[in-house]
C-alpha cells in the first residue's frame, strides 16, 4: 500500500514509523528540511520537503499512485486543502485529516466534509480522542488504559498493580487456579520502562503495569484481583478548559449530570466562556498548581483530578500537588513520550498521550481485510488486534495449537457468536470467529497476512 503522510510531527512520524514496519510504501511531506533529513536517515521512508497542500509537491510525492493520504500537519486548513487537492487532482481513494478546531466539526456544519464539498473520508480530532480515553478511565477506575473489543464483549485493560494486589509474586499460571471464575489472560507487563510479553512462569510485582484481556462481565472483579476496588468518581476537578477539557466536560455531562464537576482555568477569557457555556459548573480562575485554588476546589473531597492543559510539566506537577493535597486519583495529559514512562513512578495514576490516541484512531482506518480492530498501546510498543476469520480462510478447522504465530504474540480471547472462549490449544477455529491478540510492534502485518491477503481500506 502506498501512503502519503502530510506532516512529520509526533503523530505523522509515529504513523510513518508504524507503516514502514508493516512494509508499506511511505512518503512523508514536511516543510522542515532537517526533520525530513532525520526521517530519511532513521527509517525506510521517502521524505519530500515542501508544503503538503501544494499540487506540485503532492505530485512529486507520487499522489497519482497513492492509496491513502493522511494529513496531520499542525494547521487544519493545510490538512483540508491537501485532502481536497489529493481528491480533485490525483483521485486518491482515501483521505484522512486531523482537524483541531472544533468549529469545523460542529454538527451545525455537518455537511462540510462530504464528496460534494470537502471530500475527506475520516476526520480525526486529537482533543476528542484524548477526552474519550480519559472518559474510559473515569468509567472504569483503576485502569490506565481501556480498549473495547468485539462490540464491548471483551476489554483490554491496563492497570498498575498496587501493594494490595492479592497475586503479587505469583506466577501467571497460578492465577486461573486461584481465581477460576475470572476469565483473564495477562498479555503484557510493563516494568522499569521495558515491556515483557510474559510466559506462564513470569511473576507479578508491585508497581508493574499489567495489560490483560477479560470479558465485560468480569472486568471489575479482575481489577479487584490486581488491587483496585475504587468506585466511580462523583466529585471531579478538571484543570484546563481548552478543547480537551471542554470535550471531556461534555462527555461527562451527557452521561451523568449528577457528577459534581469543577474546572480550573487560568485564562480569563476562556474561563468566562466556560462559565457561559456551562453555567451549572463551578469555574475557578487560576492555576491548578496554586494550593489556594486547590483548597477552593475542595481538593480533599475530590475523588479524581484531571490535568489537561497544553503544558506537560504543569499537568504532571499539578497532578502531584493535587494528590499530595488529598485527592484520591489523578490523571494527566502528556504530549511527550519522555514523560509517559515516568509518571506512574511519580504517583500519577493514569497518563493519556494525544499522540498515542490519535495514532491508534488513524490506524483503525488503515487496516487490511478481516482486521476489525488495531490499536497501539504503551506508546506504540505493542498492538491489540481483533481479526475475523472469513468463511473461506485457511484457518477454518485448524486448532490453536497448529497456528504458526509470530514471536511475541499472545492470543487473548476468541469470540464465537455470543460465547467468549479462553485460548485453549484444542480449540478448533470456526468461520466468523473473532480472534483477539496482542502483538509486539511490527508483527501486525504478519497477523494480517494470516487472515487475508487482500487490501481493504476502511
Model-predicted regions and their roles:
Residues 1-458:
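Cytosolic regulatory regions of ion transport systems
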Amino acid at each position: 500500500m502506498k501512503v502519503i503522510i502530510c506532516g512529520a510531527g509526533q503523530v505523522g512520524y509515529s504513523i510513518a514509523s508504524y507503516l514502514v514496519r508493516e512494509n508499506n510504501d511511505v512518503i512523508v511531506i514536511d516543510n522542515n528540511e532537517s526533520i525530513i533529513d532525520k526521517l530519511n536517515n532513521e527509517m525506510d521512508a521517502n521524505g519530500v520537503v515542501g508544503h503538503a497542500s501544494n499540487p506540485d509537491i503532492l505530485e512529486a510525492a507520487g499522489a497519482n499512485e497513492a492509496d491513502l493520504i493522511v494529513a496531520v500537519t499542525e494547521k487544519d486548513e493545510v490538512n483540508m486543502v491537501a485532502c481536497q487537492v489529493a481528491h480533485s487532482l490525483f483521485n486518491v481513494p482515501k483521505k484522512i485529516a486531523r482537524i483541531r478546531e472544533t468549529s469545523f466539526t460542529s454538527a451545525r456544519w455537518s455537511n462540510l466534509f462530504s464528496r460534494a464539498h470537502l471530500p475527506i473520508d475520516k476526520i480525526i480530532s486529537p482533543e476528542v480522542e484524548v477526552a474519550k480515553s480519559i472518559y474510559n478511565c473515569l468509567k472504569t477506575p483503576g485502569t490506565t488504559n481501556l480498549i473495547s473489543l468485539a462490540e464491548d464483549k471483551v476489554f483490554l485493560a491496563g492497570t498498575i498493580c498496587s501493594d494490595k494486589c492479592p497475586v503479587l509474586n505469583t506466577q501467571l499460571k497460578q492465577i486461573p487456579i486461584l481465581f477460576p471464575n475470572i476469565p483473564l489472560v495477562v498479555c503484557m507487563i510493563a516494568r522499569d520502562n521495558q515491556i515483557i510479553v510474559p510466559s506462564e512462569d513470569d511473576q507479578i510485582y508491585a508497581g508493574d503495569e499489567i495489560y490483560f484481556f477479560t470479558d465485560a462481565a468480569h472486568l471489575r472483579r479482575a481489577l479487584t484481583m490486581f488491587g483496585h476496588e475504587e468506585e466511580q468518581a462523583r466529585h471531579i476537578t478538571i484543570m484546563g478548559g481548552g478543547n480537551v477539557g471542554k470535550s471531556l466536560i461534555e462527555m461527562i455531562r451527557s452521561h451523568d449530570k449528577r457528577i459534581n464537576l469543577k474546572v480550573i482555568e487560568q485564562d480569563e477569557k476562556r474561563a468566562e466562556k466556560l462559565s457561559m457555556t456551562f453555567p451549572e459548573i463551578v469555574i475557578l480562575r487560576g492555576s491548578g498548581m496554586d494550593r489556594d485554588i486547590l483548597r477552593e476546589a475542595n481538593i480533599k473531597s475530590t475523588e479524581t483530578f484531571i490535568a489537561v492543559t497544553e503544558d506537560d510539566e504543569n499537568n504532571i506537577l499539578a497532578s502531584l500537588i493535587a494528590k499530595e493535597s488529598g485527592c484520591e486519583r489523578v490523571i494527566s495529559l502528556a504530549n511527550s513520550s519522555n514523560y509517559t514512562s515516568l509518571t506512574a513512578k511519580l504517583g500519577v495514576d493514569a497518563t493519556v498521550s494525544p499522540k498515542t490516541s490519535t495514532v491508534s484512531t488513524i490506524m483503525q482506518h488503515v487496516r487490511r481485510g478481516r482486521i476489525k480492530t488495531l490499536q497501539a498501546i504503551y506508546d506504540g510498543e505493542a498492538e491489540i488486534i481483533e481479526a475475523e476469520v472469513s468463511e473461506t480462510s485457511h484457518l477454518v478447522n485448524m486448532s490453536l495449537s497448529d497456528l504458526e504465530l509470530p514471536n511475541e504474540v499472545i492470543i487473548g480471547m476468541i469470540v464465537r457468536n455470543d460465547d467468549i472462549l479462553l485460548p485453549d490449544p484444542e480449540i478448533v477455529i470456526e468461520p466468523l470467529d473473532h480472534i483477539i491478540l496482542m502483538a509486539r510492534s511490527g508483527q501486525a502485518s504478519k497477523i494480517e497476512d494470516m487472515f487475508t491477503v487482500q487490501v481493504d481500506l476502511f
